[in-house]
Amino acid sequence: MNKLAAIISSLSLLLVSQSAFSQRTLPEGPGKALVENVCSSCHSTATIMRSAGYSTAAEWHRVFSTMIALSDAQANTVANYLAEHFPEDTPRRPNLIAGDVEIEIIEWTVPTLGQRARDPVEAPDGSIWWTGMWASLTGRLDPDTGEMEEYRLPSTSRPHTIIPDAEGNIWYTGNSNATIGMLDPKTGLVTEYKTRARDPHSATFHPNGNLYFTAQGAAMLGRLNPANGDLIEVGTEPRPYGIQVGPDGTLWVAYNGTNKIGALNPDTMEVRYYEVPDARSRIRRLGLDSEGMVWFGNSTMGKIGRLDPATGQIRQWDSPSGPASHPYALAVIDDVIWYNESGTRPDALVRFNPRSESFQSWAIPSGVGIARNVWVTEAGNLLIHQSSSNQVGLVKIN
């Protein structure tokens, strides 16, 4: 990746919006020309104006050093300028809640910087895999040794999500080339299946052997039979996002473009919709507990919620860091809910115990954000990531 373009990409991930101040210029000072020229070659300077920020040059340097290798002189110039003019936005600090549960967070920086590492999963052999969306690659990590290997995928694929099958093959959603792909790690060969949907997004395997996926921009859901390549795609409500299989085989779909959760019949591909209170509600990820209750993060409202499929009843709880906390990735482990507050800096990992209705939370060490998806390991631990700083992480729950 071109170094200057990578700086742009990395800085843009720290921002909330770039629409309001699209033509504003950066403050005067040493380093302005470098940062301004680089940014304007890719996007408006408003993206930096809306940065969450850091108050020291060392913190800024730590962030972009996980994304790109610069000379000492370049790094010092950029870091000092950003620290002076874009200090920490302190209102975005998380409200961390103390508790009795102990965890250990281990993070690894992936080899190719600027790739936007995300969506780690555990393969049947215990290895950890991730997707490098911007670099069109996937990678394998040995959690015992820290050894990593990356595999190049078709250059236009920009894989959004990966999912392993029982044989250890790695399936991915080709978000930019309208494909579902499969990597055979033993040979490095890739098989692609073309989709009508332009942007396959998230995916999961069903006990029936089929792979089901969402396509956010295309507003479609799909089913692929890996045995024969048969592919069925259907239209759905706006911006389908996360997808999970429930205990009874029903597939549950989160919607990021409407205030709904969908129950997808794996055989007929028909969807039953459940409306979440408040038209502003948006759901990115969800999970199922042992009783079939659907847990979700209400990103726009700063809440987590529970849907009872039998009654349609929905109950929600305020996330500790408030309405702007933006709950994102979510998983259920032993009927306890784990999710992140992606609107805070550092990104906060939150534990919610439904039995006691109590919260506990921790700052993710690399902290830039954003954990966009999580995975429960066979040992009952949690795989996380920080896409803005190319980190893959393991949360050991004691």
Please report, for each region that a protein language model flagged, where it lies by residue:
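C-terminal capping alpha-helices of c-type cytochrome domains
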Residues: 69-94, 382
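Blade-level signature of beta-propeller repeat domains, shared across WD40, Kelch, NHL, RCC1
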Residues: 369-398
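Electrostatic cytochrome c docking/interface patches
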Residues: 18-34
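Gly/Gly-Pro-rich "capping" loops immediately C-terminal to redox-active cysteine motifs
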Residues: 28, 32, 44-70, 149-152
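Beta-rich, blade/repeat-based domains predominating
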Residues: 113-124, 155-167, 196-208, 237-248, ...
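The canonical Cys-X-X-Cys-His
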Residues: 35-46, 78, 82
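Short loop/turn segments that connect beta-strands within beta-propeller blades
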Residues: 142-146, 184-188, 225-229, 265-269, ...
